[in-house]
From Swiss-Prot:
Catalyzes the transfer of a phosphate group to glutamate to form L-glutamate 5-phosphate. It is found in: Cytoplasm. This is Glutamate 5-kinase. InterPro entries: AceGlu_kinase-like_sf, Asp/Glu/Uridylate_kinase, G5K_ProB, Glu/AcGlu_kinase, Glu_5kinase, Glu_5kinase/COase_Synthase, Glutamate_5-kinase_CS, PUA.
């Protein structure tokens, strides 16, 4: 695959990670900068690009509101600051995007929400629904409960996981550096900027350093970990200096960044991931369902004739035809017990059978490899 440097303005789905040092300074929220960023977000949406924002800053804002001292905080202090700051952060984004007629939603997640299969499917479905409704999700770590994330500052990696979860083709990490260098440019005058990284080698990983800012906790090492996750999921990732006003416009107009290139597209990477999973059960379907799967449609309960194995929601299963031939593999949206109960029934009968509303498809086409 030829290495083609991505163009930010051509993204179909863009995830933008905003570091604390960009959003918050000693005086509080950088309101003018945030308004300019949201101007860029509105312009991107007008071009037809879905946008998801992964924003740090809740703890930094909360500690200012609470008057907590400078320096490291105890875990319970960080959690308290996050609880206060999350409200302020969500309101700030809502107010900055409202003049553009853009609705926002707050999603508080942890890395577990994107790595556990059941929670992954729920997160993906929620995000897809929000984006389909024209909403800009504002994602942050749930720092009020996620003590490990507070200690290690994983918002860079969280952004990469979110990008993979929602099938983004581009991830932009806005930070206080303009990309990856061969050494720390603030201490080594011979350091060279790398505009494109085609493969994350041990030599590239060795270029990671420690955080420079006193506000942001994410250093280059976490950004390289994020890049590895993103490109494995088919998502191109860029590291850009974001302190300027209208940072997305600046990147689109050629500002210096480092792009990390994937070797596949998001959908192909996702299909490969699903195909590699060991199935926990089998679902046998009739001829009509088999034909529908061949046409790229989702698997509905009505076409299911048998369910074997024991599996939970989000687990991988294999789909077989009436003769035992393999048709597809995918992530199932119901447990084996639920699947047996609704097998052969129409989707509009699910609530009456299970006692609660469910999803129309047993396996959605986006979660299936035929």
């Amino acid at each position: 695959m030829a290495a083609v440097t991505p163009k930010l303005g051509r993204a179909q789905r863009l995830v933008v990670k905003i570091g604390s040092a960009l959003l918050v300074n000693g005086a509080g929220l950088r309101a003018e900068w945030l308004r300019a960023l949201c101007d860029d977000v509105a312009q991107a949406r007008a071009r037809g690009t879905d946008v998801v924002l992964v924003s740090s800053g809740a703890i930094a804002l909360g500690r200012q509101v609470l008057g907590l001292p400078a320096g490291p905080l105890r875990v319970e202090q960080s959690q308290a600051a996050a609880a206060v700051g999350q409200i302020k952060l969500a309101r700030a984004y809502e107010e900055a995007l409202a003049p553009h007629g853009v609705k926002t939603a707050q999603l508080l997640v942890t890395l577990d929400d994107t790595t556990d299969r059941r929670r992954y499917l729920n997160s993906r479905a929620t995000m897809q629904t929000l984006l389909g409704l024209g909403v800009v999700p504002i994602v942050n770590e749930n720092d009020t409960v996620a003590t490990d994330e507070i200690r290690f500052g994983d918002n860079d990696r969280l952004a990469a996981q979110i990008a993979v979860t929602c099938g983004a083709d581009q991830l932009l990490l806005l930070s206080d550096v303009d990309g990856l260098y061969t050494a720390n440019p603030k201490t080594d005058p011979t350091a060279r900027h790398l505009p494109v990284v085609g493969q994350i080698t041990p030599e590239i990983e060795a270029m990671g350093g420690d955080p420079i800012s006193g506000v942001s906790k994410g250093g280059m090492k976490t950004k390289l970990l994020a890049a590895r996750t993103a490109v494995a999921g088919g998502c191109a990732m860029a590291i850009a200096e974001g302190s300027v006003l209208n940072p997305l416009s600046a990147v689109a107009q050629g500002a210096r960044v480092t792009w990390f290139l994937p070797d596949t597209d998001p959908q192909a990477a996702r299909k490969r991931w699903i195909a590699a999973m060991k199935p926990k059960g089998e679902i046998t379907v009739d001829a009509g369902a088999a034909l529908a799967l061949g046409q790229g449609k989702s698997l509905l309960p009505a076409g299911v004739t048998a369910v074997s194995g024991r599996f939970g929601r989000g687990d991988p299963v294999v789909v077989l035809d009436g003769k035992g031939g393999r048709l597809a593999s995918g992530l199932v949206r119901y447990s084996s017990t639920e699947a047996r109960a609704i097998a052969g029934h129409r989707s509009d009968e699910i609530e009456g059978i299970l006692g609660y509303p469910g999803r129309a498809a047993l396996i959605h086409r986006d979660d299936m490899v035929v």
